[in-house]
Amino acid sequence: MSRRRGKVEPRKITPDPVYNDVQVAKFINCLMLSGEKSVAERLFYDALEIIQKKTGNDPYTTFREALENAKPQVEVKSRRVGGVTYQVPIEVRPERRLALGIRWLIRYSRDRNEKGMASKLAAEFIEAQKGTGSAIKKKEDIRKMAEANKAFSHYRW
């Protein structure tokens, strides 16, 4: 159902203290479990240190590129038309694009086999930057699904 009143203003997120970046702050907030923000911050910054040691590249740039590579351009939504459910491809809004990229990076980092969450995050960032990794695979699977269902794009709403 649509809202009767005006649009809801998105909450302002204060940028993180180290890189002064809102996307880093959002990532840390999504990484946080049970309100333990200091733990999430430590994990994130430790992961960036691990990236620095492993690759020698700027870890912040690695993170930004990994996040950019993990963001989906299109996704599919189910739409019921005349008793048949179609998977309709739609373009992803920029806010949702960022949210999905962050969510996938965190989810697939947690599923990895490395020891310690910081090293899992670091490994996922490095792979995502290179264009491999589970988060990128998820993005590609969804893109392929949207491509396969392109015929139903006129059911968009």
From Swiss-Prot:
Protein keywords: Ribonucleoprotein, Ribosomal protein, RNA-binding, rRNA-binding, tRNA-binding
Record Pfam families: Ribosomal_S7
The keyword RNA-binding is annotated on this UniProt entry: yes
The UniProt record lists the keyword Ribosomal protein: yes
One CC-aspect GO term: small ribosomal subunit
Biological process terms in GO annotation: translation
GO MF terms, alphabetically ordered: rRNA binding; structural constituent of ribosome; tRNA binding
Family under the similarity heading: Belongs to the universal ribosomal protein uS7 family.
Subunit structure: Part of the 30S ribosomal subunit. Contacts proteins S9 and S11.
Function: One of the primary rRNA binding proteins, it binds directly to 16S rRNA where it nucleates assembly of the head domain of the 30S subunit. Is located at the subunit interface close to the decoding center, probably blocks exit of the E-site tRNA.
NCBIfam families found in the cross-reference section: rpsG_bact
Annotated protein name in UniProt: Small ribosomal subunit protein uS7
Origin organism lineage: Bacteria, Pseudomonadati, Spirochaetota, Spirochaetia, Leptospirales
